[in-house]
Structures are given as structure tokens and as C-alpha cells.
Amino acid sequence: MSQNQKTIAENRKARHEYELYDRFEAGLVLQGTEIKSIRRGKVQLKDSYISFQKGEAFIKGMHISPYEFGNRFNHDETRDRKLLMHKQEIQKLGQSARVKGYTVVPVRIYLYKGLAKLEIALAKGKNLHDKRESQKAKDAQREIQKALKNQY
């Protein structure tokens, strides 16, 4: 992560529920009060997903809380927001998402030079066995690190 990036929100559930493959960066089409709420950290990616319609990518289900100091022109909290990506990237992701078992999920939202960016990834759902296996590997790695720390 570079100096200019500030992570606002992460979708930890995506790492647990899916095996993440290719990652892409996408810009977001936002309204004025939405970017203000994002800068305050009032955004959730938990149940959001990416859909493709007519050669365009949209994020659905992303919750951005209303801006506290906004007036009656405040934004809709869960509206569909268009993603800004290169045409080739959208086509590649759209074709990959049509393959059975694959989907595109948001991983994190961050600010880069004052602009809100969304990191998305091509993902394949894990079954219960894979989730347990990855948890065991994580626990084993944690134990190794703990043992090494106590050794010195």
C-alpha cells in the first residue's frame, strides 16, 4: 500500500467466504454527500456485489450512511453505483463472472489522492471444508509466529 492510499473499509467476509483471484481497481461515480460520508468512514461493503449490465459494471448493496450535515438533498444509502474501469477489464470480468461458481466481489474501499477507489476481485466460493482448512492453516501460522517470538 503506497503513502497516498488510506483504507476506509474492508470486506473481511469476502476473504472468508471466497477464494480471491485477480484483483482490479475501479473508480466510483458518487454524489457530493456520498464522498463526504466515505471520508468519514461511514461505508459498509458487507453484503455488496458487482453486477454487469450493457457493458457497464455496477456495485449493488454497498451502504453509505447519510452525511450528518447534509440537507434534504442527501443521497440514497443503498443505490446502485457505477464503477469506472477500462472497457477491456469490464469485458474480462463479465466473461469470468458468467462461468459457474465465479463471481466478482468488492474487497476494500480506499482513498487515493483524494479520490474514492474500490478494489474488486474475481472470486470463487469456498465450501465448508475449504473454510475449515484455511482456518487451520491460519492458526498454525499464528502458533509458529508466537513460538518464534518467544524464542528471541
Describe each PLM feature range.
Residues 1-31, 139-152:
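Intrinsically disordered, Lys/Arg-rich N-terminal extensions and targeting peptides
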Residues 23, 31-38, 112:
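Glycine/acidic-rich beta-strand-loop module
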Residues 32, 52-54, 61, 120-124:
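Flexible glycine-/small-residue-rich
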Residues 36, 44, 51, 64-67, ...:
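Short, surface-exposed beta-strand-loop junctions and turns on beta-sheet-rich folds
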Residues 48-52, 109:
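A structural signal for short hydrophobic beta-strand segments in well-ordered beta-sheet cores
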Residues 53-93:
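Helix-adjacent hinge/juxtasegments
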Residues 78, 85-88, 126-152:
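C-terminal end-helix/capping segment
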Residues 84-121, 125-127:
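Beta-rich strand-turn-strand
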